[in-house]
Amino acid sequence: MAVDAQTNLQKLNHLIEKPSSLFQLTKTQLYNKILDNNEGELTELGAINQLTGQYTGRSPKDKFIVNEPSYRDAIDWGSVNQPIEEEKFLRLSDKVLDYLDQKDELYVFNGYAGSDQDTQLRLTVVNEMAWHNLFAHNMFIRPSSKDEAEKIKPNFTIVSAPHFKANPEEDGTASETFVIISFKHRIILIGGTEYAGEMKKGIFSVMNYLLPQQDIMSMHCSANVGEKGDVALFFGLSGTGKTTLSAAPDRKLIGDDEHGWNKNGIFNIEGGCYAKAINLSKEKEPQIYDAIRYGTILENVVVEEDGNVDFDDNKYTENTRAAYPIDYIDNIAKPSKAAHPNTILFLTADAFGVLPPISKLTKEQALYHFLSGFTSKLAGTERGITEPVPSFSTCFGAPFLPLNPKRYAELLGQLIDKHEVEVYLVNTGWTGGKYGVGRRISLKYTRRMVDAAIKGELKNAEFEKDEVFGLSVPKDIKDVPKSILQPINAWSNQDAYREQAQDLISRFVENFKKFGDDSKDIAEQGGFKA
């Protein structure tokens, strides 16, 4: 039986407005609900820890975009953007709304995505679980008052029902879990997973569709700004160091994961941070550690009986997380925007151990590496990943890009030219051998190299080409051992290094074929040669 979209909308409005849907609860009220409902446990740091059960990371194979005529031609359909028919979406959302209508209480948050008011999304988030609502409160941009929240007329709504399981045969999903985006109905429908990151990444996917349509670049990156107004962007996939490297004591954080770049400069899409918490220590990452307090949500961290948190224990997953409002970081830009960037850093965790720890890129090389998006998938950020796997994620964010990647590359190229931005490739992965043989590049050295790039120390530095990749590598950086700058020198067997490097080059070349003749110039002018 066909489901009418208007009926769905009425059901959704009914859910939001019914007295048992608790609207815009404070942090304290949500804490009380979380503890009363036995959803989470209080830690000695004051943060609440949540165990998300079966799903401790995103489920990319369970993500769909509704195949709607007005949007069909713009979407880059494939394994990332899987289509689902509108009728199936409406039927499933009808079931989810009926399911939520049976609940004693629901939790509703109104807020925003995007700190630039001209392009801001107005959001309503409807949650089955109180802790998911606190997550939304922490991660999206919060209105200044309940009065302001009540006046928000949403142009996108998240409906999250983690305990609702889909029937794949009937509902057209890949499993009992689903994350479905409808641009026509302006809804993100989530079910079958308690992993809260699906909400934030769902909205990021939406912004990655909407912003480029207005000639605004959307980016999977962190950003910070120095005392003189100099802005740096850090691109990279989960676990490559975006959050860690952008949290610098002498620079103000703009945001740790999602940004837009328009005619005025950079703006944060979010109102919070979602930091990896595995092996977190006050010594290594003081800003993040100090943000873990009352109001913060920890995901899948091990908590001892006395409430003490063991950040080193990966019993549940490597992908432990901390979600906190951005103002829990002392050193932030207010509001979360800044001028045009001076420096862009592409972060990659190279599990082969062959890329230089830092190299300077031409614009053509920058576009090649942006489209390639090479990194290694790190343990726990997706289901089934237990050790690093070399992978290519277009634009350092393929799972979240609804449009053809060339659109994002085109925008980036124009902006690099217009604002004369310096671009660097930074390997935060391995040196002296591949994963299992070599060692992870020291965070202390990576911080120093990044600092040198951002502060302009490398502008007049001497560079030399590395013999295999042809990348421009600085000959010397203060307080960084010369032995690691040229990666071949860090390997005990240089022939083994060359063989491993050629293996990686062949993977780059093979991967880039998917972009076809349209990107041939980028490959010829900026690409690796087999």
UniProtKB/Swiss-Prot annotation:
Biological process terms in GO annotation: gluconeogenesis
Subcellular location: Cytoplasm
InterPro entries: PEP_carboxykinase_ATP, PEP_carboxykinase_C, PEP_carboxykinase_N, PEPCK_ATP_CS
UniProt keyword annotation of Nucleus present: no
Domain of life of the source: Bacteria
Names of the cofactor(s): Mn(2+)
Binding annotation for ATP: 201, 220, 236-244, 285, 321, 440-441, 446
Binding residues annotated for Mn(2+), in chain numbering: K201, H220, D257
Pathway annotation: Carbohydrate biosynthesis; gluconeogenesis
Chemical reaction(s) catalysed: oxaloacetate + ATP = phosphoenolpyruvate + ADP + CO2
Keyword Ribonucleoprotein: no
Binding site for substrate: R58, Y195, K201, R321
Record's cofactor remark: Binds 1 Mn(2+) ion per subunit.
GO molecular function, one term: ATP binding
Enzyme Commission number(s) of this protein: 4.1.1.49
Coiled-coil parts of chain: none
Gene Ontology terms: cellular component: cytosol
Family: Belongs to the phosphoenolpyruvate carboxykinase (ATP) family.
PANTHER family: PHOSPHOENOLPYRUVATE CARBOXYKINASE (ATP), PHOSPHOENOLPYRUVATE CARBOXYKINASE ATP
HAMAP family given in the database record: PEPCK_ATP
Primary role: Involved in the gluconeogenesis. Catalyzes the conversion of oxaloacetate (OAA) to phosphoenolpyruvate (PEP) through direct phosphoryl transfer between the nucleoside triphosphate and OAA.
NCBIfam families: pckA, PRK09344.1-2, PRK09344.1-3
The protein's name: Phosphoenolpyruvate carboxykinase (ATP)
Naturally occurring in which organism (per UniProt): Staphylococcus carnosus (strain TM300)
High-level lineage: Bacteria, Bacillati, Bacillota, Bacilli, Bacillales
Gene (name only): pckA
